[in-house]
Amino acid sequence: MPLRLSSLFLRTLREDPVDADVDSHKLLVRAGYIRRAAPGIYTWLPLGLAVLRRVEGIVREEMDAIGAQEVHFPALLPREPYEASNRWTEYGENLFRLQDRKGADYLLAPTHEEMFTLLVKDMYSSYKDLPVMLYQIQTKYRDEARPRAGLLRGREFIMKDSYSFDVDDAGLDDAYAKHRAAYVRIFERLGLPVVAVSATSGAMGGSRSEEFMHPSVVGEDTFVRSAGGYAANVEAVTTVVPEPVDCTDAPAAQVHRTPDSPTIDTLVSRSNELHPREGQPWTAADTLKNVLLSVSLPEGGTQLVAVGVPGDREIDLKRVEAGIGGALGIGGELEVEAASEEQLRAVPELVKGYIGPGLSREDALLGTESPTGIPYFVDPRVVPGTRWITGANVAEAHVYDLVAERDFTWDATLEACTVREGDPAPDGSGPLEIARGMEMGHVFQLGRKYAEALGLKVLDNNGKLVTVTMGSYGIGVTRALAAVAEFYHDEHGLLWPRNLSPADVHVVATGKGPEVLEAAEEIVAHLEAAGVSVLFDDRPKVSPGVKFRDAELLGVPTVLVVGRGLADGVLELKDRRSGTSRDIARDRVVAEITAELQGQEGPAAE
């Protein structure tokens, strides 16, 4: 049956919704594909659901093709499994928590690693049962602090998550490779260009991790790539570490007055004015900027840490968050922000704008072994023998020629600085180019983290209990749909790839006489009989101009106009993407459209 606009549950809008800040959000709402229910939560309307089912179908076909089996878990889950894996606390405020009438704790699932693990534990006990790959397409929930961009960053979203279970790492490698190849095929079929980038594992844990990033100016993520093939999420980029410097002839560190110099710019200016260096002027790269940060701990409360970075670099809090859990020995990603004024006042030994590690190793004021007890981490560029200007922990004073390791030490190095265009790739493949992108999919080699936490073991071929190794693989289904809408649109509306469009053809009946609608009904019936799905604009009291504007907004790739020329047995066939049109004979409509569909079944129809 055709989708008739005269009865379809649809309302198109002429104006953009006031809360929409990206084109995909504006157009999906205006075209009547989705409707906002609450911040970050959307209702799917009939046309939107039709596109969503097509996206899900592609994902399902590719998962089935690699031998994964579909299951379906509840979204409402008990607390206990997430306590066992420590993610009840690691997820922090991003987790939707609730209680039943008896006071038992539950959550709305952000992911399902624990539940998949327990299911396999409940059913399998021998190496003969493995390997196995399971997947689901299910609604997920995350309490985003600032939901934005419509479906791209919501609180409720649909995700395909799959999991592999193997006896050994070789099996995990095989499952990982199968999923990676399946993801490449999925994004090709969706018509979305992606870059596979190295990534951090965050709260998921595990070892190897890659993201599939769709380059986009509206993307929230930053990634880097080089001409030589290196690609990584900016949080996963490792700094090329300089060689240690011979400091045998370095002068002793000295404290100098530096009035009104609490910033790097003022410090450099004062240094060149009051304490000039022979041979070359001081620059920001000669300074060591020490910043106090507040880390939110999983069990509640905060931890102050100090991070020292070259003064010509800025701190990237996302990179800090990716590594600070490991540096503190806590694990997982932790939220980090600049220390508050109140937190700074609680450490009177440190003077804002003039914070430093101390005048010597014996007088250290930063580090877990120092009087403040504040863990001190430095950028990897701070290597033994490097000389710095840094704070003296006295107002309007700085230390000059403070030598790393000779005069101060640190607890650990931490990737904390913003990655810059032109920085060297860690693998030596050339300078880095920075790009914005949307994370479309993520594949993890989880290893044995969840299996150990939840006791998933099987008997191996020697009768010995071994811990199962796991992989986790996710694709944001609703985000992928939004990304397609963001990538394929113009100033008039959506431009669906043919294999995702809610219908194959949009038939528009124009003209006032009953013969026009009768002819359109007959043509639609013939198209449907030939297996062509039709969106039929049969609205009787709507002007041709409104119908044409709606056809452009809705984005079905082929538009058939029945009206002008009907008396001569001629119809108009429009290509929504190119804007071109041509006349075709009425008795050739079905043959020409079916031939066109057979030759243009996917994103190649663009």
UniProtKB/Swiss-Prot annotation:
Catalytic activity field: tRNA(Pro) + L-proline + ATP = L-prolyl-tRNA(Pro) + AMP + diphosphate
Main localization of the protein described in the UniProt heading: cytoplasm
Keywords: Aminoacyl-tRNA synthetase, ATP-binding, Cytoplasm, Ligase, Nucleotide-binding, Protein biosynthesis
Name of the top EC class for this enzyme: ligase
Alphabetical list of PANTHER family matching this protein: MITOCHONDRIAL RIBOSOME PROTEIN L39/PROLYL-TRNA LIGASE FAMILY MEMBER, PROLINE--TRNA LIGASE
Domain comment (free text): Consists of three domains: the N-terminal catalytic domain, the editing domain and the C-terminal anticodon-binding domain.
Family: Belongs to the class-II aminoacyl-tRNA synthetase family. ProS type 1 subfamily.
Protein name, UniProt field: Proline--tRNA ligase
Organism (species): Kocuria rhizophila (strain ATCC 9341 / DSM 348 / NBRC 103217 / DC2201)
